[in-house]
Amino acid sequence: MKLDDKRILIIGAGEVGTAVAEDLVNRSDPTEIIIHTSRQQTMDMRVGHLKEMAGPRTLLTGSWGDIFAPYELTHRSRSEINDRNVRLALAEFFLQPSGEAQLRRTTIYELISRHRPHIVIDAVNSASVCTYTEDPHQTCGELLDLARGTGGPRTAEAPAELPAVTPDIADVATDALLSLSTPILHRYVDSLRRAMADFQVERFIKVSTTGLGGMGYNCPYTHGSVTEFGLSDALVGKIGSAGVLHQLLWNLHHTAGCDVRLVIPAALIGWESVRHGAYTSRGRPVALQDCSRPLPLHLDRPLGEHAAASSVAEPAAEDEPSAEMVHVPAGDNSTYSRAEMSLSTALGQFESVTREEVAAAVLDTLLGSTRFDLFTAMDTASLQSSYLAAQMRTSTLTSMRQLEKAYDRPSIVSGNLGPTISKDLLELHVLCTAAGSLEQARTMSTTVLASSASALVREDVYLRQQALSIGLAVLLPDDQWLAGPRLSVPSRIDPEAKVTRADIDDWSRQGWVDLRPARILHWQENLRRIEQDASAGKTAFALDDTAYDVGEVLAYHYKLTGQARRIKGL
């Protein structure tokens, strides 16, 4: 891939993001580099720095905001996000179903929509910053305390009475929801998928983390946790969040049309310039404190009294001075003393890799190398489909067809692949069975075929029961329907809500067997498309007008509509 004349969006301008941008302007002439940071001050500083390095052909622009939030909340500071109504709005946003409107509300979608980058490089430490609760385990512990006080267990037959929802309970519940990284990361990746398809993003590279700098469960460092020693709950949560993100992106990598790469440094990423002065601990400035004379430590008194005595003995100055030390800033907004730096980068500990080396690996990956792409390595190491399994599949399907014929009962849907798959299989089966062959299904009058399909479902008791037994409704051409007592779609029914035409259309897309003429026409057009593609010799698909397999037909349809696994090299 050539980088000249490309628009490149870099999300995150910490050590790695900045180093990648510097390498880009040194090694190529992109049309535009967009730097997105979490804070406006950082954006202005990084863009100004890069403008001094970039050539005249490269435009440097910036944007800022919370990359995980809905766009209308992206510029809210963390203190503003502490507002109760804002936090509730965030929780509702992340936990609502991923409809198209929801996906287009996200900051990542808006960024790609606005700047139309050819390449996106995400260098944010997502595992550390994706949630909106400082201590998820404490928050969930508070929720657990509330759960213990609700009385007996809740069942469908006898729901337990929940306590009145006080503001405190609402806050604890909201905080617990915002501590869940999976919905937040899922919304981000799903919105990224939508944006990559809508705006033709050519490649996405994620720079991520092992969670422990390449160390294992024996890692002694808590990354600032003062409540635990060794591998803390906070660190385990970070590792889990990173794993969720990697798995989501790996599946996006297997999606047709999505070129996704993953680069992970497995060591402490280098450092900035050495300095002397105020420093931070756990992200906060360290205030100077002292206790110049010993105080008695009483075994029979609370520790809080001792702390109070210490503050009386050494009263704080009006302008509390900052503690100062020789230190060096490193990744994750951390600063390290000389001794800490020596320890953490020693052989056998985190060790270290320079930010320039990480940037070089990212650019190599961007240019097409797979040396540092973990997804390529995972694909290579994973066990793929085999010839033996294909032979056994053929034998198993033959046995199933023989049993179907012996019992004179079609085996179409069990419901275990979801209502939409079940709906598609049943519609195709009914359509082709009513027509008599694939050729007739493609060419018959749509109105006549809809009538024949409706008659088949009314007359074939076993087929009808197969649909209704798994919660599918059957929508007939004359505004009538067939339905059992339990419906899979919609999953929740409002007893007071009136059914609208829009509801029916929505439910029929999700999981109602739709035998109306418009849906029949949809399948006829797609069957013709399959026939044209197969006739062109582009596939090994056996197009037999009478001995067809409805599962194979639907698989072909999914392949043509982008709902198939990505084939390596394509």
Swiss-Prot record:
Q: Does the keyword Oxidoreductase apply?
A: yes
Q: Which residues does the entry assign to the active site, renumbered to this chain?
A: 306 (proton acceptor)
Mutant lacking the gene: phenotype: Cells laking this gene are unable to produce indolmycenate.
Report the top EC class in one word.
Answer: oxidoreductase
**Biological process, per Gene Ontology:** antibiotic biosynthetic process
List the keywords (alphabetical): Antibiotic biosynthesis, NAD, Oxidoreductase
Q: What is its EC number?
A: 1.1.1.397
Question: One MF term in GO for this entry?
Answer: oxidoreductase activity
Q: Which reaction does it catalyse?
A: (2S,3R)-2-hydroxy-3-(indol-3-yl)butanoate + NAD(+) = (R)-3-(indol-3-yl)-2-oxobutanoate + NADH + H(+)
Q: Which family does it belong to?
A: Belongs to the LDH/MDH superfamily.
Q: What does this protein do?
A: Involved in the biosynthesis of the antibiotic indolmycin, an inhibitor of the bacterial tryptophan-tRNA synthetases. Catalyzes the NADH-dependent reduction of beta-methylindolepyruvate to yield indolmycenate.
The name this protein carries in UniProt is: Beta-methylindole-3-pyruvate reductase
Q: Which source organism does the UniProt entry give?
A: Streptomyces griseus
Highest classification ranks of the organism: Bacteria, Bacillati, Actinomycetota, Actinomycetes, Kitasatosporales
The gene from which this protein is expressed is: ind2
